[in-house]
Amino acid sequence: GDDLGFLTCFALKDGKHKWEFKTDARIVGTPAAADGVVVFGSADANIYGINAKSGKLIWKHASSKAVLGAVTIEKGIAYIGGSNGSFYAIDIKSGKLRWEFTGVKGYIETRPLIYDGKVLFGAWDNNLYALDKATGKKLWSWDANLTRMHFSPAAVWPVAADGRVFVTAPDRMMSAINATTGETLW
């Protein structure tokens, strides 16, 4: 995606232009593709599902504000955050909303992590959120206790291993968080 609102597809084999799809505003977040569908958000306040071969629109889900978040897809469900304080789980084949979590106070642009039945993502309200992957229910949130927004979990993509979630803020400090409870380990 680009600042002009185009999502462009190039052939993996030779880099030749295959298709492009135009939205009404810039595309900021990294798209994701699975099962022949490319999913991405746009600053035009929509989330799109595009046919990966043809570049044709399959579905469009409207949001109330720009959707700048990167997408993660797992088992046919796309997970993406918006600028309206909402986080979405959408069926990639039908575009049907599985659930929407509306408890975020800042906008979301980070790429979600799927780990141990949870969806984890940071937001510009200085929190890292853990939602139940199946229901969208908030399990916990972790406050970075930082006074500057730019040292927020929103600016990083979380990773996880051995029951711990790791985030490194732009100040280069790494934190380990218990993936079950959201408690800071170090």
Predicted regions and their residues:
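Extracytoplasmic beta-rich repeat domains
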Residues: D3-F6, H17-D35, S42-N46, L57-E74, ...
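Short loop/turn segments that connect beta-strands within beta-propeller blades
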Residues: A11-G15, N51-S54, D91-G95, D132-T135, ...
